[in-house]
């Protein structure tokens, strides 16, 4: 009989979702770099992405500039890595010691070099064009540590995937979802009179944002910008995540406790505003709200808008669409164009 894998005091049977970070990692970051959290908060181009993978016993605390990961502190099996992890392209910008023991002044230099390097502009902002990464940072900050007393929800996770014990279990667990998606894509091709891409995928990778409102509803939010064709297809991608999380919520009776623990940890370390502490719902409602966010939606053609609505009505009729009130504030409002 095959033994079940015990991780962090619980058993991984098929899937897992537990992104609360190792406390040892956070303690060491606070001791060695007590300035780092306030530094990120004071720079509008920066945001946090954090996580944990109980299967590999790995936790991470990353700093992003748009969609570019510029620094990661990580731990494995409770041991904190001495050297920060970063993509090779960013390592070229600074001396090796920076990635072992960064200082605020060095970080200023690092950011200036990133901003002036052409190949990194696509991750955040070109001279006149605000890319998807710009809005990801803007919205990510707005609904975490910049959350307001009047807000009904917070974002508690970003760029995430559901974990699986094995690749075989993942394929088996997802099969009914992929089959359902594939059937609807076939139906779309038969019923939609406009032009569609030759290839439309039934399954996808990372969720952009997960949110939680005061009613206990989970919000799945997919961000699109600068690619109208992908905006039109976003209900298909969001439907995949919706079906995945719906199934996970049915099967994982500890999901609420793990989400609550993540949120409380982030509040304790200042990654989510303290005003939300008394708003955490007592349980999940069972409702999942699928959403697309278009940072700036005024440039979408009528063809794209019509295609989006057709696909939405087929895949996720309840899907909501949002846009930002401004390019500097990040508050979400219902899109009038979608």
State what each model feature region is.
Residues 1-338:
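Charged, terminal alpha-helix-loop-beta segments
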């Amino acid at each position: 009989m095959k033994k079940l894998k015990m991780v962090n005091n619980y058993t991984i049977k098929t899937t897992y979702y537990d992104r609360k970070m190792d406390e040892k990692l956070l303690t060491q970051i606070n001791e060695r770099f007590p300035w780092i959290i306030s530094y990120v908060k004071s720079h509008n181009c920066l945001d946090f992405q954090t996580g944990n993978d109980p299967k590999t016993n790995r936790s991470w605390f990353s700093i992003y500039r748009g969609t570019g990961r510029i620094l990661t502190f990580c731990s494995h099996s409770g041991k904190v890595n001495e050297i920060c992890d970063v993509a090779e392209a960013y390592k070229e910008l600074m001396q090796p010691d920076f990635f072992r023991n960064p200082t605020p002044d060095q970080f200023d230099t690092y950011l200036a070099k990133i901003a002036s390097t052409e190949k990194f502009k696509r991750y955040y902002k070109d001279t006149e064009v605000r890319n998807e990464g710009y809005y990801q940072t803007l919205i990510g900050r707005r609904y975490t540590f910049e959350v307001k007393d009047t807000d009904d929800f917070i974002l508690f996770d970003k760029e995430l995937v559901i974990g699986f014990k094995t690749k075989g279990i993942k394929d088996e667990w997802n099969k009914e979802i992929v089959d359902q998606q594939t059937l609807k894509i076939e139906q779309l091709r038969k019923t939609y009179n406009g032009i569609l891409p030759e290839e439309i995928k039934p399954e996808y990778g990372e969720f952009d944002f997960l949110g939680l409102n005061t009613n206990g509803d989970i919000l799945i939010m997919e961000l699109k910008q600068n690619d109208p064709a992908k905006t039109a297809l976003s209900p298909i991608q969001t439907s995949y995540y919706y079906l995945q999380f719906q199934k996970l919520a049915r099967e994982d009776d500890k999901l609420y406790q793990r989400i609550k623990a993540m949120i409380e940890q982030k509040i304790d370390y200042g990654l989510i505003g303290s005003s939300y502490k008394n708003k955490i719902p007592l349980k999940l409602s069972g409702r999942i709200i699928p959403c697309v966010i278009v940072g700036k939606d005024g440039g979408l053609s009528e063809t794209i808008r019509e295609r989006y609505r057709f696909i939405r009505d087929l895949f996720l009729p309840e899907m909501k669409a949002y846009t930002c009130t401004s390019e500097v504030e990040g508050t979400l409002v219902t899109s009038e164009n979608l």
